C-alpha cells in the first residue's frame, strides 16, 4: 500500500523536527516534546514546504529572514515560559492496569489535560512569541516598547493566554492569606483521593479565623477556591544561556471571576503569604520585573 502524501496547512512540530534534526536550530525545550524524527514518508514534503515558505533555501539552509525569526527561540537576553493547562477540555480515558494497583486505589480511568506550551523572549528591542498546541505551532515577533518593556512582555504573553481578549482581569480587592494555612490544609487523603471540596473549605475557614484573618478577606479567598478554574499556567523566568529559575507566579482563568494572578509575598510583619489579585497588564508586568530581578 502506498502511503498518501501528507498535507500540512501551516508550520507544524514536524517542520520544526525536520529543522532540529538537520542542526538548523537547537532543540527548544520549553515547547514540550517534539517528535523524535519526522515520519520518513513526510520528509520530502516537509522540505518542499519549508522552501516554499522561504524558511530554507535551495541548499536546505535557513534563509536570512528565517534565521532572524527562529533565533528568538534560543538566542535572547532573557525569556519567560510556561505550560497552559486547559482543565475545561480534560478528557478521561481508560488504561490497562494491574489488579494490584487497582486494589490500592489507583483507578483505571485517568484524565488527559490538553496543554499549550509557550515562550516569550526578548532581545535587541524585539519580543519573540512561540506557542505549540498539539500539532499547531506558531512563531511571531513584535517590537518591544523599551520605555515600558515589561508591559510589552505582559501583552505578548496574553497574546498566547488570552488571544481574543475575551477574558477580563478579575475585579476584586487583593487577597493575602498566610502561606502556612494553605500548606497545612490537605487536599488529598493518604491514598491520593481528593477530599470533598466542602470539607476543605470548612477547614480553611476555621484555620483562617483562628489566625485572625478578616472575614471579608477569607470570604473572597474561599469564593476563589470554590469557583471553577478553567485553565492556568505558571510563568517562569529563564536567563540568557541558563536553565529556568524555580520562582514563578500563576495566572488562572476562573469561571465568572476572570483572570487571577497568584503569587507569594510577605505581610507587614514579614510572614510569607499567598497573594491573589486581578491579572491586569500592570500586575503581570510587575511580577515579570520581579522574576528578572532575582
List the predicted regions and their residue ranges:
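Extended, charged low-complexity segments
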Residues: 205-294
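Basic, Lys/Arg-rich alpha-helical nucleic-acid-recognition elements, primarily the DNA-binding modules
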Residues: 1-85
Amino acid at each position: 500500500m502506498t502511503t498518501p502524501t501528507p498535507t500540512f496547512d501551516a508550520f507544524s512540530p514536524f517542520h520544526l523536527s525536520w529543522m532540529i534534526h538537520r542542526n538548523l536550530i537547537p532543540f527548544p525545550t520549553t515547547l514540550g516534546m517534539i517528535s523524535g524524527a519526522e515520519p520518513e514518508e513526510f520528509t520530502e514534503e516537509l522540505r518542499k514546504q519549508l522552501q516554499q515558505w522561504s524558511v530554507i533555501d535551495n541548499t536546505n539552509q535557513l534563509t536570512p529572514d528565517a534565521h532572524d525569526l527562529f533565533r528568538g527561540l534560543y538566542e535572547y537576553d532573557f525569556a519567560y515560559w510556561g505550560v497552559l493547562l486547559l482543565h475545561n477540555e480534560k478528557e478521561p480515558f481508560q488504561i490497562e492496569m494491574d489488579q494490584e494497583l487497582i486494589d490500592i486505589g489507583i483507578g483505571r480511568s485517568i484524565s488527559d489535560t490538553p496543554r499549550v506550551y509557550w515562550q516569550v523572549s526578548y532581545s535587541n528591542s524585539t519580543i519573540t512569541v512561540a506557542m505549540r498546541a498539539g500539532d499547531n505551532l506558531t512563531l511571531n515577533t513584535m517590537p518591544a516598547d523599551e520605555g515600558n518593556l515589561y508591559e510589552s512582555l505582559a501583552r505578548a504573553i496574553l497574546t498566547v493566554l488570552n488571544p481574543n481578549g475575551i477574558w477580563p482581569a478579575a475585579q476584586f480587592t487583593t487577597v493575602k492569606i498566610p502561606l502556612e494555612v494553605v500548606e497545612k490544609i490537605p487536599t488529598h487523603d493518604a491514598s491520593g483521593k481528593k477530599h470533598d471540596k466542602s470539607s476543605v473549605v470548612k477547614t480553611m475557614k476555621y484555620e483562617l479565623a483562628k489566625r485572625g484573618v478578616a472575614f471579608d478577606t477569607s470570604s473572597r479567598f474561599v469564593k476563589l477556591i470554590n469557583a471553577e478554574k478553567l485553565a492556568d499556567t505558571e510563568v517562569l523566568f529563564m536567563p540568557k544561556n541558563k536553565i529556568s529559575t524555580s520562582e514563578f507566579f500563576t495566572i488562572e482563568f476562573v469561571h465568572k471571576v476572570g483572570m487571577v494572578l497568584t503569587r507569594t509575598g510577605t505581610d507587614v510583619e514579614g510572614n510569607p503569604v499567598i497573594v491573589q489579585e486581578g491579572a491586569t497588564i500592570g500586575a503581570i508586568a510587575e511580577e515579570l520585573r520581579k522574576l528578572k530581578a532575582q
